[in-house]
Amino acid sequence: MTRRLTNKLLGASALVLAMAGGAAWAQDVVAPAVGAPVVAAALDTRSTGEASSGVIVLDADARRHRLVSAAGLAGLEVLDLTGARLGQVPAGEAGGLDVRYGFPIKGRPETLLVSTDKTDNALRFFAMRDGAPVEVGARSVPLGFAVEDVCMLRNASDGGLYAVAVGDGGEIEQLLLYADAEGRVDARSARRINLPSKIKYCVADDATGQLYASQQAVGVWRFNGDPEADAAPALVDAAGLGRISEESGSLALYDGGQGARYLIATDASSGRLFVYDRGAGDAYLGAASLTGRDGAAIKEPGALQAVGAPLAGLPSGALVVTDEDAAAGPDYKLVSIAALTGALNLSAGTPQDVRAVVAPRFPTVVAVAETAPVGSPGDAADDPAIWADPTHPANSLVIGTDKKAGLNLYDMQGRVLQHLPDGKMNNVDLREGFILGGQPVVLVTASDRTNKAVAIYRLDTEARRLINVADGVQPTGQGDPYGQCMYRSARSGKTYVFINDSNGEKRQWELVDAGNGKVRVVRVRDFAFSSQVVRTLLRARG
């Protein structure tokens, strides 16, 4: 389900100054480096009409490696690695661009490109086929904000592939990518993170799950790329207070194996490249300046891509540098990774094959249905209870908690049938066969953190509605009612509810007919655990 996360970060200057008391900062405050070594490009491509970003797309046949350029209104341009232009594909106003390998389309692994279309502020998808991009998107995926860049991230846990779009207003939108039965690629939002000002670039590390974002006025951030993880950022380097002089620029990741995994970032104001050690918490390693083959300085490097694969004349791969201000017109420079690391007395290591798709750590089970997103931001969709219709399974119902707003009742297509804004409901459970007013009913209870109470409902399976049947507020007497479950004794037929406090204390109540069409609780016993119990499941044995 979609998770909407908003970091309440107040402003660029206040943000950096607050790091000691908030998000972690990976670097000490130091003056910018001086006297950085100069590294010349190994190749300058021929000038293109516009060069927003470029990626090298690898092929099994090295002669068919391609450089794909996001060329603004010219769409996507295709060049060989000598810089010769081979073709062009319409893609709207192409800006940001990224590539991943082994994406399944109709059961076949394909090389997938994602690009931003700045005309519509949307994402478009292409498969690399016979050396050229072929559009395979089910649609142009709208973002709803002014997009600046896009990067992709493969989740190592389940193998899911995500596109991460960043925007002019500080938006970070993470979308899960999938192909339908017809082979069309689509996306759905997984989470949104907001920073208070423009994010210009992003890059992601599939191996570690780290997402890096360049907030232009502030610096380089590192996030956990798992959409279910805490979105708390760590500041790798800061503009003004760190090594970045004024504005943070583009980002790239190089993987040379153990001891040679680097984050590369540009200082948009000075034109320097900064290199950080991803194996040591992104510790700073050194800085360099770049020139073209002719020695002309690359004053403001644009988008970057690092390719850790042997290329012709470049045994450790290349850093693709966008040079929008080249004298002869915008082009791309290929900088030898070996030359760059050598200038900084670093090891290039052993280039890792970016085309190798590592098997996910856990098996993947694909859902056959998904509910509409809950209305509250953050980790709000927490706990479901399912009523299974024994006669017509398609009419079964799902009750889910919105931990910040109440309960939702869904049908089996995921549509919201009812929303009850009754408080912060943490967990929910149900039992059939409770006798209320002489009739068996489906009884539903939830741990209500707003009123510190047991919330009690009857599920009307015909009307498909939840009806509050609590005999007034049923207080728990707990400081923070948290994990909850129900139990029906097979021996006595009595129905119970258990709720634990966040301090580990658990309390049990019997649910009884109050005689007025309502239900009340009668406290049965207390017992304690040494720490907080998030959720308890009970199996009826007597």
Task: Enumerate the predicted regions with their spans.
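Sequence/structural signature of beta-propeller domains
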Residues: Q27-G542
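Gram-negative bacterial Sec-dependent N-terminal signal peptides
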Residues: T2-W25
